[in-house]
Amino acid sequence: MNAIPLRSAVTTQGRNAAGARALWRATGMTDQDFEKPIIAIANSYTQFVPGHVHLKDVGDIVADAIREAGGVPREFNTIAVDDGIAMGHAGMLYSLPSREVISDAVEYMVNGHAADALVCISNCDKITPGMLNAAMRLNIPVVFVSGGPMEAGKAVAVDGVVQAPTDLITAISASASDKVDAQALLEVESAACPTCGSCSGMFTANSMNCLTEALGLSLPGNGSTLATHAKRRDLFTKAGTTIVELCRRYYGEGDASVLPRNIATREAFENAMALDMAMGGSSNTVLHILAAAQEGEIDFDLHSIDQLSREVPCLSKVSPNSDYHMEDVHRGGGIPAILGELYRAGKLNEGVHSVHSATLKEWLLSWDIRSGAATEEAIELFHAAPGGVRTTAPFSTENRWSSLDTDAEGGVIRDVEHAYTADGGLVVLRGNLAEDGAVIKAAGVDPSIWHFEGKALVVESQEEAVRVILDKKVKPGHVVVVRYEGPAGGPGMQEMLHPTAFLKGAGLGKECALITDGRFSGGTSGLSVGHISPEAAHGGLIGLVRDGDPITIDVHERLLQLNISDEEIERRRAEMEASDKPWTPTTRQRKVTKALRAYAAMATSADRGAVREVK
């Protein structure tokens, strides 16, 4: 293998680069630096988001490690939208489109300055996916290191029942219950989110950070090491050291195996989704993994995910589907332990590697605490425990668990023999209501309602869904149909966390269903079907459903069906096509800005990851 010229040489070498060198010198670079790889650090610090509020200085930790290892670090920032704060109002329209803004921003900065490599400091819902999309586009050496999960909240009583521990979903559900008075609600919200970090359950942010481990693009422990623990600092330092080593191998030795598209191959994407099925990850991960595959030109689609969901069992249930939180997953050995159980059961592709290990076997032998050969470093890492102190400071505790959770029968991470279900935690549904597919987080659905038949109650916005629930118009047996909330129809594909949490708070969690061409928060549980494709704005059948129509949802049979005749469907379709404004909401009043209209004009449906289609 031959050496490859640094990308940055166009700005650092030769007479024609004198102007660029002059500007680099103004940033502090020297003659010696012009011979080294320039490594971009994409940070996402903001004071708006608890998952990012602690990231202000962590770029310096990465930069120091890069500098010491022989690289030249250069940091920049991206935006970060907090889905929880944006939830329930017009702010949520901006969440998914922000993924594309982040992808573009990273690409613009890296290519605009001809950087040689990239470290992505991400954490919350759209930031990790946005940076992942950019990394797959750029295909230069990259390492992901996230801000880490929040600690779970302390126990409080809600409606006479002790919630131990609490989290964001506890607070939202409590707000919808008439039995929770103002003082009790204050106690819940004050306890739910005690520290910096991404919300403490297996919600979208933590799910995606776990998946970067399985894709091979981050270091072991990235998905589960708490934001508040000193061990998290080590991950930032190692990320800096690792990226310089990847640069040496690629540019110095011509070793293209270190590039993202050669690490995150189709086989790695299959492993990542196998992990997702096993850990009961957020349904949003389907959207983001499909998008990343498209950006990297990887042959991986919704059919691939459907096949995996039939073959991979659910080995872990974490909040909102149980009382376990990410700190418990970490105590159980984190992502390497889940991957280890899948590996021993023959559920993973072995021919993959990562930014830290040459083979999957080597990776899991060293880092899976159940392998029998785990390193002392791994054992020490997974002993990292919460501090139990309210704080926005990272690395502020060195607490240790007294023991690890290696109970494969009833612990936080089970083996295949003791799996919760033989199928995965995420299921792809099809039928006349979802010809191109829909997604349900089966791990969050009580098995007693895996087959559900009900009558449609149609609304055309998330806001209207909230109103009909809080006004007690939703009754047992209803299927709440929320349409025109897809990528183009919203636009922006809003999350339906408030409607589902309010259904749960109203005691209807097992009595009703909610289906939508929008999406759900990673904190959603219950019979909630999202990502219906094609969406209403693109002529999907969901746009023709009327109040009272019978609908069948069957998780076992993977079915989502509107039970009316083909003749009636065609009659309604012809009527819609002949209307003044076909495939648009009839009563909804919503201000849509130019920025959102630009996204809507290019947005594809959820089955393609809601990426933009640019011709």
From Swiss-Prot:
Active-site residues, record numbering mapped to chain: S521 (proton acceptor)
Full protein name: Dihydroxy-acid dehydratase
Cofactor(s) essential for the protein: [2Fe-2S] cluster; Mg(2+)
Superkingdom as given in the UniProt entry: Bacteria
Enzyme class: lyase
Catalysed reactions, as listed in the record: (2R)-2,3-dihydroxy-3-methylbutanoate = 3-methyl-2-oxobutanoate + H2O; (2R,3R)-2,3-dihydroxy-3-methylpentanoate = (S)-3-methyl-2-oxopentanoate + H2O
UniProt entry keywords in alphabetical sequence: 2Fe-2S, Amino-acid biosynthesis, Branched-chain amino acid biosynthesis, Iron, Iron-sulfur, Lyase, Magnesium, Metal-binding
The protein's Enzyme Commission number: 4.2.1.9
The keyword Cell membrane belongs to this UniProt entry's keyword annotation: no
Residues engaged in binding [2Fe-2S] cluster: C124, C199
GO BP annotations, alphabetical order: isoleucine biosynthetic process; L-valine biosynthetic process
Binding site for Mg(2+): D83, D125, K126, E495
Molecular function via GO: 2 iron, 2 sulfur cluster binding; dihydroxy-acid dehydratase activity; magnesium ion binding
